[in-house]
Amino acid sequence: MKFALFPNTCAKAGKPVFEAFRKSLRYHQVWLCENTDLVPVDVGVMWSVLTNMYGRKPIYDYYKTKVILEVGGLKRNQTWKVAINGINRDAYFGNTDVDDSRWKQFNFDLKDWRKNGDHIIVCGQNPNSEAWDLPDISAWWKNVITEIRKVSDRKIILRPHPRSPVNFKITDSNVEIQQPKFVGEYDKFNFEESLQNAWAVV
């Protein structure tokens, strides 16, 4: 097969992933392309898919089949997603018949459901991401608060995406906005602190 790779679409942390993927294609024909070089091949390879695309849209539209590389959902910047024709719910990951060996490599210790805690954390998303397909995010925040208040009077902590702050007025005195704090490593924030004594996460 013939592949066109677009390494300049790549995020900083993903460059080693892109290079590893390039090396995995050693038995195929590969073109390393600038973002404007749309080479007629079987598969285009690019980094991520965003709503506004940041110059990626011509690449995405040109190739009928594309491989999308993306940061992993678990152990961010230690794991990665490789999918066909999209990310998250819109992608094909080739994971229909897989065993649990990959899951075991995460070495997670799953805890029981908490039965107590002081607050409920609501995690937001960046509306410029393809991971977001709902209406206006401010309306979403307000709706989530309303729905939680139907079943709980616990304190609510709104924790927005680091690149998408909450931008509406809070009228409930028991709702707090907690902007994620950078903790030194690339793309690592203080979420674990927020989880201490949390009753639930939305």
Please identify what each model-predicted range represents.
Residues 49, 57, 186-202:
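A donor-sugar binding/catalytic signature common to diverse glycosyltransferases
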